[in-house]
Structure formats: C-alpha cells, structure tokens
C-alpha cells in the first residue's frame, strides 16, 4: 500500500476509535504491522478531532512526543533479561546460537542486541516463511528489507547468498542453544517444544505476547529448559511506553 492509502486508513480508523480512548482511559500502542508511521497518522487524527495533545498513543516519533529507543526497547529488554537469567544459571550468553522468529521491531532489535552481546542469531521469519543464515543474520540487510523496502524475507538471499529461505514454519527445528519467539501469539506449539528439547535448547524467552502454548510451556519446564514468560521478558517496551505517557 502507498503511504497515502495507509494514512487514509489510519485516519478513518481513528475517527471512530477516538470515541473510546484517552490518556486516562485506554492507551493503544503499535504491534504487528503498526509502527511509528501508523501511530503518527492516528495521533495526528486524534489531535485534529479531539483538540488534545496528550499521551493517548505510544510508539510515536521523537518529534511529537515519542520516547528515545522506544522502537528498540522490547527487543533490547528481552536480551537484557535473557542474559541475566542465563547468568543466574551459570551460563554465558556470548558464544551461544539463537533462533529468533518474526522480523518486526521485536525480532529485529532482539537480533541486533543478541549479536552485540556475543551470541549468533541464525533465523528470522515472517508470515510467508523463514530464513536460516549459518553465518549469523545480517541485521543491516534485515532492516533494509523490512523497515525500508517493506518487503518479504525472500529478498534476504540477495544480500546473503549462503543463507537458506524456507516457506512455511520451521524455525524451531533448527539446532540452537536459545529460542526467542518474537512473532505472534501461540506460534510455538508442543511439537516445536519437543524439537527444541531434542536439539538441546537450554532457554526459551518470549519476545512476543504469549507466543508459547500452554502445552509447550509445560513441556519445556518439565524438561529443564529455562523459560521466561513474555510478561517479564518483553516488558522493556511497556516500561518505555510508560515514560512516553508521562
């Protein structure tokens, strides 16, 4: 869709939504497919209709009330918690291989921070398929594909010829030390948990909201896998949104 089409949709959506939200009522934030651009269009329409400049949406741009590093906050926070959780168990994050699902804000910046901390992320995914890069995901290429070109991961192989693109699901079948589900709800099922355990995965930390099914969670915990639920693991974004609201 063109920017104009996206703007028209966001403005129409907010024309109705503004009746039900407010700084002291409900405060929406971005999620899958909704970033600073879309939040900006909606915030502009809210101001136009209500005549109020208040903390009614989070994830805005820095020039109109956003918080520094809000885009990175959820992914970065996930890795800070993962690193500390591993340390509590006498394990270093550096040198570990990591599977990440998704390729939105959470996944991109979780991948970036993981590699800054010395781990190697070898997978990312989107709604059509997933990429395996044994040399480690190229974050700059991933950002260009997803944030600039708004394209599919099928483009990744143009940047990294040695990588593999697979259609459908399959991220959790790769042999890794750590799994970070960062895509969507209920994406990691019991059979995925069984594959992770069989491949020697030592930790699963949730970047998305409730990405691991109850059966999968119970299986991971029963098999001694370190598990961090999203309520704690992805709270970096919420914490930074609170700063934006204030």
Task: Explain the meaning of each model-derived region.
Residues 7-18, 39-44, 76-83, 108-115, ...:
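Predominant activation on well-ordered alpha-helical scaffold segments within soluble catalytic domains
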Residues 1, 62, 66-76, 228-240:
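Conserved phosphate/anionic-ligand binding catalytic regions in large, soluble enzymes, centered on
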Residues 22-24, 91-96, 174-177, 196-203, ...:
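Short, surface-exposed connector motifs at secondary-structure boundaries
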Residues 183-246:
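Rossmann-fold NAD(P)-binding glycine/threonine-rich loop
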Residues 25-30, 51-57, 100, 123-126, ...:
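General beta-strand structural signal in soluble alpha/beta enzymes
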Residues 58-61, 66-175:
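Glycine-rich phosphate/diphosphate-binding loop of Rossmann-like nucleotide-binding domains
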Residues 1-68:
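N-terminal ligand-binding/catalytic initiation module
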Residues 33-38, 126-131, 233-236:
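Glycine-rich beta-alpha junction loops
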């Amino acid at each position: 869709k063109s920017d104009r089409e996206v703007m028209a949709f966001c403005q129409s959506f907010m024309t109705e939504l503004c009746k039900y939200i407010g700084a002291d009522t409900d405060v929406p934030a971005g999620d899958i497919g909704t970033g600073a651009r879309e939040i900006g269009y909606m915030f502009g329409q809210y101001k136009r209709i209500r005549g109020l400049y208040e903390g009614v949406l989070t994830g805005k741009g820095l020039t109109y009330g956003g918080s520094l590093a809000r885009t990175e906050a959820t992914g970065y926070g996930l890795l800070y918690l993962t690193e500390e959780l591993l340390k509590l168990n006498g394990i270093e994050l550096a040198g570990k291989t990591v599977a990440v699902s998704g390729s939105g804000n959470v996944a991109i910046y979780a991948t970036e921070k993981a590699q800054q901390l010395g781990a190697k992320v070898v997978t990312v995914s989107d709604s059509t398929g997933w990429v395996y890069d044994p040399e480690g995901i190229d974050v700059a290429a991933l950002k260009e594909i997803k944030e600039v070109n708004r394209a599919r991961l099928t483009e990744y192989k143009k940047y990294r010829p040695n990588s593999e693109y697979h259609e459908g699901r399959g991220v959790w079948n790769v042999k890794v030390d750590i799994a970070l589900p960062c895509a969507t709800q209920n994406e990691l099922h019991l059979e995925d948990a069984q594959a992770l355990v069989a491949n020697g995965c030592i930790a699963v930390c949730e970047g998305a909201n409730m990405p691991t099914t109850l059966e999968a969670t119970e299986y991971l915990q029963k098999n001694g896998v370190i598990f961090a639920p999203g309520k704690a693991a992805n709270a970096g974004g919420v914490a930074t949104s609170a700063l934006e609201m204030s």
